[in-house]
């Protein structure tokens, strides 16, 4: 059964000073990143963050009703698109929403909802990169965009993300790529169903929103749990916001454009999409969806398999080059300079080289080269890409 619930996470405040959001001087207490702790600092959030709603969509089916994923949506608000009529003014026509941009993000291993990560004996170390926190980072990176975090369908041992609905995978989520698994069909229908599900949820005056009062001033610690409050060791309840000054347009596929981002294990989804391009284009709806994809980001891709971390098949990349999609790769020494997994760096170099030779617009950047390879820097690629 489809469902949704609001998510609010105090650790979002911990990342705001690093991202340049809000008043850093007033957030000194929030700079200390302790597992599950929300600090207690009251930060002045930027207008962009205040105007966003976070919605968890559970059990959203794809092309096959038996294959579903959870999605986390951080919605963009209409900026200056709704006129507040003065008393006595004649009724005005409802403005048409502008074309929307949607960012689709596929997380890596261990990434989960903040509440789950803080309770795990090992994964709590990486709670700053929870699904909610990364959604906020992406919202800052892609302003005025709808941020969709597409959660893997299975997490082996609570660590290894497995995208079984997008690509044939082994127990630990290492992919076995082919040309007809149906990743594009699943993604397209997943979005269609998620958009429909969120239509009413994100309409005006339907939900509480993140604003300066609900996040900063009116979030109070409470020992009890609430679905409407901020999650953490101590749940913080948020009062209802002033909805009259805000306008939220529901997600729409009409004239929409897309950015696809894979991080670490999440890159296996992007790779599978490349393998399916030729066949997927035969479906007119999916072909239209492919043409609406503007950019794809590979962020430090990696998985537990012994090869195929990056796509290096010329015939597959030739088909990809014909799409005109802009490609960005951002990597760290943790992946591409690991002597025990030397194929990753070689495959990455070949991926970029072949696409460049095919005339595709592709950029490649390696980060943290002067620092020792670490998982922390692997995650920090979110901050610098």
From Swiss-Prot:
GO cellular component term, pick one: mitochondrial matrix
UniProt keyword terms in alphabetical order: Electron transport, Mitochondrion, Primary mitochondrial disease, Respiratory chain, Transit peptide, Transport
Transit peptide interval: 1-24
Domain of life: Eukaryota
A GO BP annotation: oxidative phosphorylation
Signal peptide location: none
Primary location recorded for the protein, binned into one broad class: mitochondrion
Localization terms from the record: Mitochondrion matrix
Annotated S-S bridges: none
Pfam families: C2orf69 (PF10561)
Functional description taken from the UniProt entry: May play a role in the respiratory chain.
Disease: Combined oxidative phosphorylation deficiency 53: An autosomal recessive mitochondrial disorder characterized by global developmental delay, hypomyelination, cerebral atrophy, microcephaly, liver dysfunction, and recurrent autoinflammation.
Protein family per UniProt: Belongs to the C2orf69 family.
Protein name, entry field: Mitochondrial protein C2orf69
Organism (species): Homo sapiens (Human)
């Amino acid at each position: 059964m489809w469902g949704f619930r609001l998510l609010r996470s105090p650790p979002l405040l911990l990342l705001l000073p690093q991202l340049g959001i809000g008043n850093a001087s007033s957030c000194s207490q929030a700079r200390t990143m302790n597992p599950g702790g929300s600090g207690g600092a009251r930060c002045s959030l930027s207008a962009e963050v205040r105007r966003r709603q976070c919605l968890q969509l559970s059990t959203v089916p794809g092309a096959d009703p038996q294959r579903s994923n959870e999605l986390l949506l951080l919605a963009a608000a209409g900026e200056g698109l709704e006129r507040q009529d003065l008393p006595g003014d004649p009724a005005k026509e409802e403005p048409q929403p502008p074309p929307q941009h949607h960012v689709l993000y596929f997380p890596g291993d261990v990434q989960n909802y903040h509440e789950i990560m803080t309770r795990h004996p090992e994964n709590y170390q990486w709670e700053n990169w929870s699904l909610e926190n990364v959604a906020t980072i992406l919202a800052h990176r892609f302003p005025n965009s709808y941020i969709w975090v597409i959660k893997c369908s299975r997490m082996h041992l609570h660590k290894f993300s497995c995208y079984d609905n997008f690509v044939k995978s082994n127990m630990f989520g290492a992919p076995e790529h082919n040309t007809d698994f149906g990743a594009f069909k699943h993604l397209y229908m997943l979005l269609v169903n998620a958009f429909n599900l969120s239509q009413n949820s994100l309409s005006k005056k339907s939900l509480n929103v993140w604003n300066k009062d609900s996040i900063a001033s009116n979030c109070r610690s409470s020992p009890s749990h609430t679905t409407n409050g901020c999650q953490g060791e101590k749940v913080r309840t948020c009062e209802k916001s002033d909805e009259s000054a805000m306008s939220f347009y529901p997600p729409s596929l009409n004239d929409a454009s897309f950015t696809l981002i894979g991080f670490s294990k999440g890159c296996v989804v992007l790779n599978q999409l490349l393998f399916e391009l030729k066949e997927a284009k035969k479906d007119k709806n999916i072909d239209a969806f492919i043409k609406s994809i503007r950019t794809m980001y590979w962020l430090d891709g990696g998985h537990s398999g012994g090869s195929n971390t990056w796509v290096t098949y010329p015939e597959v990349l030739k088909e990809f080059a014909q799409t005109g999609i802009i490609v960005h790769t951002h990597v760290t020494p943790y992946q591409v300079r690991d002597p025990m997994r030397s194929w990753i760096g070689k495959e990455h170099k070949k991926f970029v080289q072949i696409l460049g030779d095919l005339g595709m617009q592709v950029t490649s950047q390696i980060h943290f080269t002067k620092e020792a390879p670490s998982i922390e820097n692997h995650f920090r690629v979110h901050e610098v890409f």
